[in-house]
Amino acid sequence: MTIQRFLKEYGLFGSILLGIVAYRPLSVLSPMIPYVLMTMLFFTFSRIAPRDIRPRPIHLTLIVTQIVLALGGYFLVRYLPVPYAEIYAQAVLMCFLCPVAAAAPVIVGLLGGSIAIVTSYVVLNCLSIIITGPLILGWLGHPQGTLLESMTHVLVGVLPIVMIPLLTAFGIRWKLPSVHARVRSLSSASLYIWIFLLSLVIANTVHFVAKERQGVATMIIVLVLIGLVTCIIQYSIGKAMSRKVLGESVTIGQALGQKNSSISIWMIQSYLNPIASVSQAAYSIFQNIFNALQVIHHDRRQVLEQRIRHKERN
């Protein structure tokens, strides 16, 4: 077994377990997350060409789907005759409305999907959330700042993390082709960085949940379940759309299912009941577990296919 395969098999879940068990010391390193993420994205973006980054019809479909799920889910839950219905509705709203994670292109690359389509969507989705997010939350929630302040926060929180490594990778591709070729040859770099980053993200999420001590146990359990159910719904819809449009289940599945929890939690804290952010924290844990399972399954399938091809040649 190669080191890369060993890390895919055991390193990912080991990283998740480490983040849960050692969340206190690791959460101190949370300021490193944006910089580690940008480094990981740089290696991923070195594998695509500038001409591949462009809007596509599927991007508009994804944005509309996201908004419909968010508003439909909110109003469906808001008027249920149960205690804390408004808090649950806010949690559902944000689990659907949350922008796509900047790390989505990395996972798509590890799973053999289209990095270009997801990278384009990360940028377009960020721009759409800058406009629609504050408007929707200002309508349904209780804003603590101006519309311009909210739009600026989302812009500063997401766009540089994607654009800096993207432009750096394209610049090196153009000016330093030999360096670019060397960077492209480091195909395992994104995996190694993701294993480290995953432990920090999980630790930061668990630390956040541990601090949220308000609310009864039943409410917390329901909020966690909301994170799980909305995660399943979005990955399922995304994968079904991806099979129909692209003939594979990875690309659109990650675009719709993998979320930027830090931005979502901030938006909840700014507009809605803060306890609703427990669902988004739970969503982050579930999506990372699912991503790890996908990478392991993809790696095992590749190994099996290689063995079959080897037998056929012999």
Task: Please tell me what each predicted stretch does.
Residues M1-N314:
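Alpha-helical transmembrane segments of multi-pass small-molecule/ion transporters
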